């Protein structure tokens, strides 16, 4: 039974690739390219759109690249920034609230990264980028300190 399903799936994929390769493609890929500017439909994969939005939110190229790199590196450094004595978030309502705000901010940045560079999206991207760094670098350590002090009671 399993081999039959795998063979049917492989047959379907082979038919798709060999007889209709453009069926799942983006029609924007067939427009003539301007070598002086990046086409608007060119964007990174969905899991890097939040970093792309942070890159575009800073007008300076070097500043944007530094913000992009730091936005990814900060995710690697987050376990080291965690200074709370209690490891679980079950009994830490401030951290839970902060976590869900960060998730909403990351979803907003991901959405903005896929939008064109126009007026309302630029401002939203800049505010969401500031909030991203503010939550991770300022609010999370302060929240951990407050919750550590509450544990002493």
From Swiss-Prot:
Domain of life: Eukaryota
Alphabetized PROSITE patterns for the sequence: CYTB_CTER
GO biological process: mitochondrial electron transport, ubiquinol to cytochrome c
Its membrane topology: Multi-pass membrane protein
Major site of localization recorded for this protein: mitochondrion
Entry note: cofactor: Binds 2 heme groups non-covalently.
Extra facts: Heme 1 (or BL or b562) is low-potential and absorbs at about 562 nm, and heme 2 (or BH or b566) is high-potential and absorbs at about 566 nm.
Job of this protein: Component of the ubiquinol-cytochrome c reductase complex (complex III or cytochrome b-c1 complex) that is part of the mitochondrial respiratory chain. The b-c1 complex mediates electron transfer from ubiquinol to cytochrome c. Contributes to the generation of a proton gradient across the mitochondrial membrane that is then used for ATP synthesis.
The protein's name in its UniProt record: Cytochrome b
Species of the source: Cervus nippon taiouanus (Formosan sika deer)
Name of the gene encoding the protein in the UniProt record: MT-CYB
